[in-house]
A protein has these predicted regions:
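Basic- and hydrophobic-enriched, low-structure N-terminal and domain-boundary segments
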Residues: 1-96, 103-111, 115-120, 125-150, ...
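Conserved P-loop NTPase motor module
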Residues: 3-8, 24, 28-32, 47-68, ...
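Conserved H-loop
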Residues: 124, 350, 380, 387-388, ...
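A short helix-turn-beta junction within AAA+ P-loop NTPase domains corresponding to the substrate/partner-engaging
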Residues: 161, 395-407
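Conserved beta-strand position immediately N-terminal to the Walker
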Residues: 91-92, 307, 383
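Conserved AAA+ ATPase core "coupling" helix
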Residues: 173-174, 410-419
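The conserved Walker
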Residues: 97, 389
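P-loop NTPase motor domains
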Residues: 104, 110-118, 126-131, 136-373, ...
Length: 482
C-alpha cells in the first residue's frame, strides 16, 4: 500500500522506516502518522515537553503506525507500507534458502512489537531464537537503521523461549484436548474434538484402512462425549478408562460400530500414554495463550511479549504435528473468547509447508485452515513462511491477502506456483533472478517489486545446548527482558 501524493505530504523523510514515534510538539492527528525518526523503527522521545492538553479533553487512543516492509525497486524508491490491521488477513513469505524471506517476516514482527503487538514464533530449526541470546543484544551493528531498531527492541521486548519435549529447557505441557470445550456452541465443540482426535490418531499412526478409520471415528466420539459429561480435563488416563469401560453413552453414540474396537483403541491410547510422557509432561508450564502473549498475570509493564517455541526437541514429525495441532486448537479457542476488531497478536510459522502441505492431510491441516478463516475476526495475524513454496497448499490463498514472493529457483516449485503467480500478475521468469531481499509483493491484485528492509536480528542457527540454556534462563526469570 504505497501512500498517495497527498499522503506523502504528511509523511516526513524519516517515516520511511516504519517506526512508532512520539511527537516533538503537539501535531495534528494527521501529522502524527510518520516522522523523520520513524524511518529507523525507533520510538522517538520528544525534544521538548509537549503542551499539556486541556484537562477536560479525553485522551485519544494511540494511533498505530504503518509497518514498512521496504521500498519499491524503482527510481522513485517509494516506501511500501502496510496498515498493521491488514495482517489480520494474513501473509505468506515464499522463497528458497537465502532469499531473505525470514528476515522480512521478522522485520514485520519487530515493528509490530514496538507498537505493543505480541507475537509467537514457531521455530523448527532454532534460528529464530536469537532474540533470547545475549549476543544479539550486545553485538555492534554497522547499519544505523538496524542499530536503532536493536536499541528500541532492547527497551521494549519481553522474550520467552520454550522447548516443549525437553525438561532441560522450558517445556510446555499440552492437553490432549483443550479445556473449556463444553462451553462452546455444538458446531465449534464438535469441530475442536474432531481436530483433537485427528491429532491423536496421527500420534497413533492410524492410516486409511477401514479399521483405522473406525478407530478415528470412535476416538472423536469418545472425546466429544467425555467433554459433555464432565468438566474434568481430558487426560489419556481418563480417556482410556472411558473407552475401555465401554461407557453406555459412548456405545449409544457410535451406534453399530464394532465394540471390539473399544479394546483396541484403549490399548493403543495406553501405549501412547507411556511413550509420550515427556510430550505431555504435567509438571511443565501449561500451554496457555496468556502465557505466550504476555497477558494478564504474565504481563510485564512497558514490554511486549515475544514467545519463541522451538519444536526441535519434540522428536519425529508425528510428535511435531500433534503438538502444533494442539497449539492451533488452543489459539482458535482463545480467539473465540477474546475477539478483537483490530490486530492484537501475530503468529509466525517457519517452514509452514509441514503444517499445510498441498497433497497430504496431516493433523495440523484442518486446524490451520480453520484458523486462517477465523483469525481475522479475532484480530490475529498469521504469517506463513516456507522454503518449499511448490509444496505449499495454495488453496488457502483466497484467505491470505499478502504474498511476499522471493527468489525461487527450482523448476518444480515454479511450475506449481504458476497459477498463483498468474493470478497475481507476476512474471514467473523474474522470480529465479531476484537477489537476496528482493520480493514481488502481491496483494489485492496489485504487485510491487520491493527491496525489503532487514530485521534487527540476523538469523543464525543456535545449538541444542544453547537453546536449552537460554530457555531455562527465561523459565527461571519468567521471561528475558534485555
Amino acid at each position: 500500500m504505497n501512500p498517495s501524493r497527498d499522503e506523502e505530504a504528511s509523511l516526513t523523510e524519516t517515516a520511511r522506516y516504519g517506526v512508532p514515534i512520539q511527537p516533538a510538539s503537539a501535531p495534528s492527528t494527521d501529522d502524527v502518522s510518520l516522522t523523520e525518526t520513524a524511518r529507523y523503527g525507533v520510538p522517538i522521545q520528544p525534544a521538548s515537553p509537549p503542551r499539556a492538553p486541556p484537562p477536560a479533553r479525553p485522551e485519544s487512543p494511540r494511533k498505530r503506525e504503518p509497518v514498512r516492509v521496504g521500498e519499491t525497486d524503482s527510481l522513485l524508491r517509494e516506501p511500501v507500507v502496510f496498515n498493521p490491521d491488514e495482517f489480520t488477513r494474513h501473509a505468506a513469505f515464499l522463497g528458497g534458502p537465502g532469499s531473505g524471506k525470514t528476515t522480512l517476516a521478522l522485520n514485520v514482527i519487530e515493528q509490530l512489537a514496538l507498537q505493543g503487538v505480541p507475537s509467537i514464533l514457531v521455530d523448527r530449526k532454532g534460528d529464530l531464537a536469537g532474540y533470547a541470546s545475549d549476543a544479539f543484544w550486545t553485538a555492534t551493528v554497522g547499519d544505523p537503521r538496524r542499530a536503532m531498531r536493536q536499541t528500541a527492541l532492547r527497551d521494549r521486548l519481553d522474550v520467552a523461549l520454550f522447548t516443549p519435549g525437553h525438561p532441560g529447557g522450558r517445556p510446555l505441557a499440552i492437553p490432549i484436548v483443550p479445556d473449556g470445550l463444553d462451553a462452546l456452541p455444538d458446531f465449534d465443540r464438535q469441530q475442536a474434538t474432531r481436530h483433537a482426535a485427528e491429532a491423536l490418531a496421527g500420534m497413533l499412526d492410524y492410516r486409511q484402512s477401514p479399521k483405522d478409520k473406525s478407530c478415528r471415528t470412535l476416538l472423536a466420539q469418545a472425546i466429544d462425549q467425555y467433554v459433555q459429561l464432565t468438566r474434568e480435563s481430558v487426560s489419556l488416563e481418563r480417556l482410556v478408562k472411558f473407552i475401555g469401560d465401554k461407557d453406555p453413552r459412548l456405545v449409544n453414540a457410535v451406534g453399530r460400530l464394532d465394540v471390539k474396537l473399544f479394546d483396541k483403541l484403549a490399548d493403543d491410547l495406553d501405549r501412547l500414554r507411556l511413550d509420550a510422557k515427556m510430550l505431555l509432561d504435567s509438571g511443565a508450564e501449561k500451554l496457555d495463550m496468556d502465557l505466550l502473549l504476555g497477558r494478564g498475570a504474565h504481563a510485564t509493564a512497558g514490554r511486549t511479549r515475544l514467545s519463541i517455541v522451538s519444536t526441535k526437541f519434540l522428536g519425529d514429525n508425528n510428535n511435531v504435528l500433534f503438538w502444533v495441532s494442539q497449539l492451533l486448537i488452543e489459539v482458535t479457542r482463545w480467539l473465540s473468547r477474546n475477539p478483537s476488531p483490530t490486530l492484537q497478536a501475530a503468529i509466525l510459522f517457519d517452514e509452514a509447508d509441514l503444517y499445510l502441505p498441498a497433497t497430504r492431510q496431516p493433523s495440523t491441516k484442518q486446524p490451520m485452515e480453520n484458523l486462517i478463516k477465523r483469525a481475522r475476526s479475532g484480530g490475529l495475524g498469521l504469517m506463513l513462511a516456507t522454503q518449499s513454496p511448490g509444496d505449499f497448499d495454495y488453496k488457502c490463498r483466497d484467505n491470505i491477502r499478502a504474498w511476499f514472493i522471493g527468489r525461487v529457483k527450482e523448476k518444480v516449485s515454479l511450475d506449481k506456483m504458476k497459477p498463483m503467480l498468474s493470478e497475481a500478475r507476476v512474471d514467473p521468469a523474474k522470480i529465479p533472478g531476484q537477489a537476496t531481499g528482493e520480493f514481488h509483493v502481491a496483494r489485492d491484485g496489485r504487485v510491487d517489486r520491493v527491496k525489503a528492509e532487514p530485521s534487527a536480528l540476523a538469523t543464525e542457527q543456535l545449538s541444542d545446548d544453547e537453546l536449552l540454556r537460554l530457555a531455562a534462563r527465561t523459565r527461571d526469570s519468567g521471561h528475558l527482558s534485555s
